[in-house]
Amino acid sequence: MESPKTFMRKLPITPGYCGFIPWLSCQESSSEDRMNPCVKAFQERTQRYKEDQQGLNCSVANTPPLKPICSEDTVLWVLHEYAKKYHPLTLECKNEKKPLQEPPIPGWAGYLPRARVTEFGYATRYTIMAKKCYKDFLDLVEQAKRAQLKPYEQTYDVRAAQPLSPSSKILQLQGLSPAFPEFSGPGQTPPSEDPQAPRPCGCAQWSSQSCSRNVYGEPPSLAKAFAES
């Protein structure tokens, strides 16, 4: 039994056919006079495409195979090591520190240092741009580490503040004499003074000033009002 022939394979087209005609929509008019040239041009172009494919297959089959530069085991080992180090689904150790120039995950669009302030990303692939940006960033970090840092006082011309010596009034209030600055600690007296001797009120040491408090430490106005009452 013979196979049925494909419809519309031979020209001319059956009169009254109103189905799809290739390239007919690109013509000036869609009349029946344009149907036969469109189908004929489509068949010729399809035949040329088939001949080109056959020629390409013949040339590929006749081309001698390339010589491998390494064995298949080496290629598999390299792929295994790469997947072991950089595959995003593998569990990594927390103590393992990956290099900064690690190849980025395909599709990752995160932050890249020095990417927007330099021209490393112009007319280059993303991996090349990432490698250049990371390298420039590492160079800047190493340069900053090697730079000699000046101290704060030398950078801003600031001199260290000298400790102030206690004034004579503070020493007098503490019962010390300015002539013996080494006995400035609390509870210490100069060697010339007797620790058992009674000490006068601190207000009496200033002859030019009058004492404004009585024995009980109250102002004179309050003490006078209390005595009159």
UniProtKB/Swiss-Prot annotation:
Tissue expression from the record: Expressed in testis (at protein level).
GO CC annotations on file: axonemal A tubule inner sheath; nucleus; sperm flagellum
A biological process from GO: flagellated sperm motility
InterPro entries per the UniProt record, alphabetical: SPMIP5 (IPR043246), SPMIP5_dom (IPR055215)
Subcellular location: Cytoplasm, Cytoskeleton, Flagellum axoneme; Cytoplasm; Nucleus
Region (Disordered): 181-201
Quaternary structure and partners: Microtubule inner protein component of sperm flagellar doublet microtubules.
Role summary: Microtubule inner protein (MIP) part of the dynein-decorated doublet microtubules (DMTs) in flagellum axoneme. May serve to reinforce and thus stabilize the microtubule structure in the sperm flagella.
Name of the featured protein: Sperm-associated microtubule inner protein 5
Organism: Mus musculus
Upper classification of the organism: Eukaryota, Metazoa, Chordata, Craniata, Vertebrata
